[in-house]
């Protein structure tokens, strides 16, 4: 199960941190161990670290209206979203 970091900009840190939408959207996709991070120098720059059992399912879900609505609710600026997937060195 890969660990993934998604970082992006937001409109309001306190609203984003308090929102249940992350869990509501990602939980049914099997995403676990969701942790949030805030840049102390720029609190509108944030990240989410999570374990994702099915990357294809999550990436497919990210293109839905439900994902767009969840991001809009949370104040995410979707054009700033970058997703990084845990990588292992080649053997």
Question: Which residues does each predicted region cover?
Answer:
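Short S/T/G/P-rich N-terminal loop/turn motif that feeds into the first structured element of a domain
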Residues: 1-91
